[in-house]
Structures are given as structure tokens and as C-alpha cells.
Curated annotation (Swiss-Prot):
<keyword id="KW-0479">Metal-binding</keyword>
<feature type="binding site">
    <location>
        <position position="25"/>
    </location>
    <ligand>
        <name>Mg(2+)</name>
    </ligand>
</feature>
<dbReference type="GO" id="GO:0032456">
    <property type="term" value="P:endocytic recycling"/>
</dbReference>
<dbReference type="GO" id="GO:0003925">
    <property type="term" value="F:G protein activity"/>
</dbReference>
<dbReference type="GO" id="GO:0031901">
    <property type="term" value="C:early endosome membrane"/>
</dbReference>
<feature type="short sequence motif" description="Switch 1">
    <location>
        <begin position="42"/>
        <end position="47"/>
    </location>
</feature>
<keyword id="KW-0653">Protein transport</keyword>
<dbReference type="GO" id="GO:0042175">
    <property type="term" value="C:nuclear outer membrane-endoplasmic reticulum membrane network"/>
</dbReference>
<keyword id="KW-0968">Cytoplasmic vesicle</keyword>
<dbReference type="GO" id="GO:0005886">
    <property type="term" value="C:plasma membrane"/>
</dbReference>
<keyword id="KW-0472">Membrane</keyword>
<dbReference type="GO" id="GO:0031489">
    <property type="term" value="F:myosin V binding"/>
</dbReference>
<feature type="binding site">
    <location>
        <position position="40"/>
    </location>
    <ligand>
        <name>GTP</name>
    </ligand>
</feature>
<keyword id="KW-0342">GTP-binding</keyword>
<feature type="binding site">
    <location>
        <position position="23"/>
    </location>
    <ligand>
        <name>GTP</name>
    </ligand>
</feature>
<feature type="binding site">
    <location>
        <position position="125"/>
    </location>
    <ligand>
        <name>GTP</name>
    </ligand>
</feature>
<dbReference type="InterPro" id="IPR027417">
    <property type="entry name" value="P-loop_NTPase"/>
</dbReference>
Length: 215
């Protein structure tokens, strides 16, 4: 029986990190479903989503792990950092506390992922300009000082959501092309021409769980 060909050439593993309530699940849903969830449930542990994109003529399947922001789940969610090719680190532009905690999230990301993991800083809820509590300029400076990509976005309107995931993928693909990302390394977070059945995952991690409400 003939094997069904893949309709993508690479798999990139992403994680989404940041405080509870910054809109991580809403960003994931907007990217994968093109819809805004007004009542995004709190993520319990992790949630999973996928989407196929195109970068430089290559079809790439993004496997995206949305991690819980509550401190009580940090021990569980840290295990999902390993083997991530990209990380979206999210804060809420209307809540300075979520911005102030970025250094802690960045420390975890740098300690638990490989040195070539692409990290993009996302200032979510850009549609709430009147309630802004973190300036674009200071967040951009933080990103530049720490070697991060940076965008402000809105999970509600969809502004820059596509770009957030695509810009990280472009950088990862660039790292593959220039040889700075070793695809043979288990922690690279990238699979090229995967041999597992379609729908297979990069890891054998348990199914994510959700409950409650919030974002």
C-alpha cells in the first residue's frame, strides 16, 4: 500500500509563554482558527494547536504548545520548553505587572531551550490603546537588549497575529539555511521530512487539559 505523501517539509515546535490572562490561548486560537474567543478558558498545564504555513516556498507545520501562566503549573510546563524551535513570550500592554515578569519568563526560556531557539516578544491587546500601561518604546528596547524579535498584536482584531508566528518561522528557517541550527540535534525543535504518520507529534507528551474561564 502506497504511503500518503506529506504536504509539508518541516515541523517546527513552538511554545507560548507568559503570565496568566495575557491572551496566550486567544492568540493561538486566532492564529489556528482565525477567530477570537471572548471567553478563552485558562489553560491547565498545556494546550496544543497546529497550522501549516509557507516560508520561502517551503511548507512548514507549526506544532504550538500553549503553556499555563499560573505559578502552580510552572513545574509541569517547563518540561515543554525542551526541544522548542521557537518561543512566543507574551505580555499584556494594559498590565505592567505582566511586563515586569518578562525577565523571569526569559530566564526560563533561555535555561530550558537550546541556544538557537528563536524568541519573539509579543505585546498583546494592542486594540486597547486607551488602557496602555507599557509603552511600545520600552518593550522594543527590552527586546533589543535581549536579542528578541518584537511585535505588538491583538488577538481580538487579529492585528500582527499572523506576523508573530511567521516572523519566528522565517528566523528559524534562516538558521537552518545558514547552518546555525543543527537538525540532527534532538533539542533543535525541528523535523525535516518527518517519517511519522501525519498528525504525529514531536514528543509523547500527555494530552493538554483545560478548564475554567479567562484567557
Amino acid at each position: 500500500m502506497a504511503t500518503t505523501p506529506y504536504n509539508y517539509s518541516y515541523i517546527f515546535k513552538y511554545i507560548i509563554i507568559g503570565d496568566m490572562g495575557v491572551g496566550k490561548s486567544c492568540l493561538l486560537h486566532q492564529f489556528t482558527e482565525k477567530k477570537f474567543m471572548a471567553d478563552c478558558p485558562h489553560t491547565i498545564g498545556v494546550e496544543f494547536g497546529t497550522r501549516i504555513i509557507e516560508v520561502s516556498g517551503q511548507k512548514i507545520k507549526l506544532q504550538i504548545w500553549d503553556t499555563a501562566g499560573q505559578e502552580r503549573f510552572r513545574a509541569v510546563t517547563r518540561s515543554y520548553y525542551r526541544g522548542a524551535a521557537g518561543a512566543l513570550m507574551v505580555y499584556d500592554i494594559t498590565r505592567r505587572s505582566t511586563y515586569n515578569h518578562l525577565s523571569s519568563w526569559l530566564t526560563d526560556a533561555r535555561n530550558l531551550t537550546n541556544p538557537n531557539t528563536v524568541i519573539i516578544l509579543i505585546g498583546n491587546k494592542a486594540d486597547l490603546e486607551a488602557q496602555r500601561d507599557v509603552t511600545y518604546e520600552e518593550a522594543k528596547q527590552f527586546a533589543e537588549e535581549n536579542g528578541l524579535l518584537f511585535l505588538e498584536a491583538s488577538a481580538k482584531t487579529g492585528e500582527n497575529v499572523e506576523d508573530a508566528f511567521l516572523e519566528a518561522a522565517k528566523k528559524i528557517y534562516q538558521n537552518i539555511q545558514d547552518g546555525s541550527l543543527d537538525l540532527n540535534a534532538a533539542e533543535s525543535g525541528v523535523q525535516h521530512k518527518p517519517s511519522a504518520p501525519q498528525g504525529g507529534r514531536l514528543t509523547s507528551e500527555p494530552q493538554p487539559q483545560r478548564e475554567g474561564c479567562g484567557c
